């Protein structure tokens, strides 16, 4: 027997038993962004490597360690997209979507990062994101946070996630704070772990996010970013908090919250959970007003967020909130004998036409009564429709209940659609 080829480590199949939960999550996401008037954008999986070097930052972990980068036959450096924001900005600039315009966009699709696989975090993962362009005021920051809160409500996990909020100021304020932070870290360099020492000059704000307990104890005396904010940034952050208070969205200001990508400014946020261990972030985002110009467009304010679907699916499974996921089939149609096969196929086709939301599976491949009922039960259907020679002669269908103890019954062929519509509503 030939050796089986396995999936690449960290890149997982989503099997038929798992896909209904994914479909439920995706449906909630699509319905939620539609309620806010956002439009979908789809971008290629492969982009020029420079796009991510210029946007994410060359000294970030993603660019330094995690990107899937290769040369094509023309010698061009290409990369499997590690995140969605840069591609959305590139597409917006390329097609004139962002020039003196407001855009509310969303995307969903696979991303790729070569990092250590762990539960809920994989090398191929699926990301859902929202991006808004052309609006610089705090009310749009509040809107994307309200939208994200709506997602948790619709998924039934509002009580299991909390919002953390911070501001990074504008680029000048951030630069001034960066110098003060470097000066502070230099005084404690011998107590920093290797990773923090490496980041101290290249990306010092990421040291604030260190998980090392000793580093965290040192940071208790570090300068506070809030002390370096100008009036405009302070007012922006204050207005955002006022709006969130007004609509009842609870949050915690976390002065050490920074984002791992270089392009963020002012508002940054994360939704976190205590239900998934140390890897608690389930959604993150913020404002990135300089990125559009950085990638060749006009200065354009922007804000957005992204979430990994694997994390959301894992959270729902961990919280045991998957019980209401419907089976893939509502009705299973079985022919009791070859002479009834054509009639069974006709019944299934008519039901698909008259009841388009009804999920109808036809038995194929023959087999005796016991085998067909076994397959019907395995399909997850609520009922099996049995058509034998007797039913054919009398113009009826036998309805066998598969999920309860109701006695089977016969239903006239011409009344079947109405019967099933009532049964499955």
Curated annotation (Swiss-Prot):
Q: Does the keyword ATP-binding apply?
A: yes
Name the principal localization, coarsely classed.
Answer: cytoplasm
Which EC numbers does the record give?
Answer: 6.1.1.21
Protein's GO biological process: histidyl-tRNA aminoacylation
Q: Which GO terms describe its molecular function?
A: ATP binding; histidine-tRNA ligase activity
Q: Per the record, what are the reactions this protein catalyses?
A: tRNA(His) + L-histidine + ATP = L-histidyl-tRNA(His) + AMP + diphosphate + H(+)
Q: Which GO terms describe its cellular component?
A: cytoplasm
The family database entries (InterPro entries) matched by this protein are listed as:
aa-tRNA-synth_II (IPR006195), aa-tRNA-synth_II/BPL/LPL (IPR045864), Anticodon-bd (IPR004154), Anticodon-bd_dom_sf (IPR036621), His-tRNA-ligase (IPR015807), HisRS-like_core (IPR041715), HisRS/HisZ (IPR004516), HisRS_anticodon (IPR033656)
Supply the enzyme class, top level. ligase
Show the SUPFAM superfamilies listed in the entry: Class II aaRS ABD-related (SSF52954), Class II aaRS and biotin synthetases (SSF55681)
Task: Give its localization.
Answer: Cytoplasm
Annotated keywords? Aminoacyl-tRNA synthetase, ATP-binding, Cytoplasm, Ligase, Nucleotide-binding, Protein biosynthesis
The record's annotation in Pfam families points to: HGTP_anticodon, tRNA-synt_His
Q: How does it assemble?
A: Homodimer.
The record's annotation in NCBIfam families points to: hisS
Family membership, please give it.
Answer: Belongs to the class-II aminoacyl-tRNA synthetase family.
Protein name per Swiss-Prot or TrEMBL? Histidine--tRNA ligase
Q: Gene name?
A: hisS
């Amino acid at each position: 027997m030939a050796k089986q080829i396995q999936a690449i480590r960290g890149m997982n199949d989503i099997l038929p038993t798992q896909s209904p939960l994914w479909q439920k999550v995706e449906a909630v996401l699509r319905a939620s962004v539609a309620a806010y008037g956002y439009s979908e954008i789809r971008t290629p999986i492969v982009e020029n490597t420079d796009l991510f070097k210029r946007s994410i930052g060359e000294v970030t972990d993603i660019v330094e360690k995690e990107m899937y980068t290769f040369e094509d036959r023309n010698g061009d450096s290409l990369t499997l997209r590690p995140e969605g924001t840069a591609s959305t900005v590139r597409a917006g600039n390329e097609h004139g979507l962002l020039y003196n315009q407001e855009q509310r966009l969303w995307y969903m699709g696979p991303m790729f990062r070569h990092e250590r696989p762990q539960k809920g975090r994989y090398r191929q993962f699926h990301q859902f994101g929202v991006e808004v362009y052309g609006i610089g005021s705090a009310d749009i920051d509040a809107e994307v946070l309200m939208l994200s809160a709506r997602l948790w409500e619709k998924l039934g996990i509002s009580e299991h996630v909390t919002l953390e909020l911070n501001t990074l100021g504008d680029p000048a304020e951030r630069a001034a704070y960066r110098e003060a932070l470097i000066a502070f870290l230099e005084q404690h360099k011998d107590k920093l772990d290797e990773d923090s020492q490496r980041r101290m000059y290249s990306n010092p704000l990421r040291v604030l996010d260190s998980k090392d307990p000793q580093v965290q104890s040192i940071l208790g005396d570090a300068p506070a970013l809030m002390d370096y904010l100008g009036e405009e940034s302070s007012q922006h952050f204050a207005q955002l908090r006022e709006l969130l208070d007004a609509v009842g969205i609870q949050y915690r200001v976390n002065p050490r919250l920074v984002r791992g990508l270089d392009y963020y400014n002012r508002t940054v946020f994360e939704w976190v959970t205590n239900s998934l261990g140390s890897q608690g972030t389930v959604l993150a985002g913020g404002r990135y007003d300089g990125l559009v110009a950085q990638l060749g467009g006009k200065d354009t304010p922007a804000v957005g967020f992204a979430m990994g679907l694997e994390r959301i699916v894992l959270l729902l499974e961990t919280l045991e909130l998957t019980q209401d996921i419907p089976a893939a089939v509502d009705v299973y149609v079985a022919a009791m004998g070859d002479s009834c096969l054509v009639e069974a196929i006709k019944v299934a086709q008519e039901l698909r036409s008259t009841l388009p939301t009804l999920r109808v599976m036809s038995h194929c491949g023959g087999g005796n009564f016991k085998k067909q009922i076994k397959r019907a039960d395995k399909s997850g259907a609520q009922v099996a429709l049995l058509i034998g020679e007797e039913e054919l002669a009398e113009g009826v269908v036998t309805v066998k209940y598969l999920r309860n103890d109701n006695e089977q019954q016969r239903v006239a062929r011409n009344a079947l659609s109405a019967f099933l519509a009532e049964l499955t509503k």
